[in-house]
Amino acid sequence: MVKKNNKVAVFDFDGTLTSRDTMFDFVAFACGKMRMWIGVILFSPIIAIMLMKIIDNNRCKQMLLSWYFKGMEYEKFRQIGENYAVRARKLLRDDTLQLLRQRQEEGCRVYVVSASIREWVAPLCLSLGVNEVLSTEFEVDDSGLLTGRFSVHNCFGKEKVKRLLLVEPDRDDYYLYAYGDSRGDKEMFEFSDEYKKL
């Protein structure tokens, strides 16, 4: 067995680093609560179909977020994400934050791997000193506008493992800790050397 001198720690964001899911919280912050609720009502049949696993969450999530943000200038969206970091900091879980800092002090390379959109996750997480944020990302057209489509696959389930391997390809070289709270973290748990559901 190869001795693993290096250590990597992977944290989910929504419900793991934060006390709750941030998608609708961010949408309300960016678009207002009224528009957020209109979208929820309009897309409730599609959300129900997704929960019954008739369509995958990637397609449902893309349709919903497209309704809110398609056509928005990327720079405006990015700035909203930067501003949201101040609010999101109040949602951090003290226990998970302490664990993240512990892993950093041990010399782990730390990644946040999230199905949420990079622009509202990265500003906060990078300020915590993580090495990188691996997440879902919006496509931006040549005019600098959001197309409403994702430029990468929704970073959920097995996609989380794929994204980690892009930045940490030599799996035999490191001991992997994984932390999450939902079924979207199952494949990462199975891929890790040690995991904890928080």
Walk through the language-model features, giving the residues of each.
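Short, compositionally biased "basic patch" segments
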Residues: A48-K53, R59-Y74, E132-E137
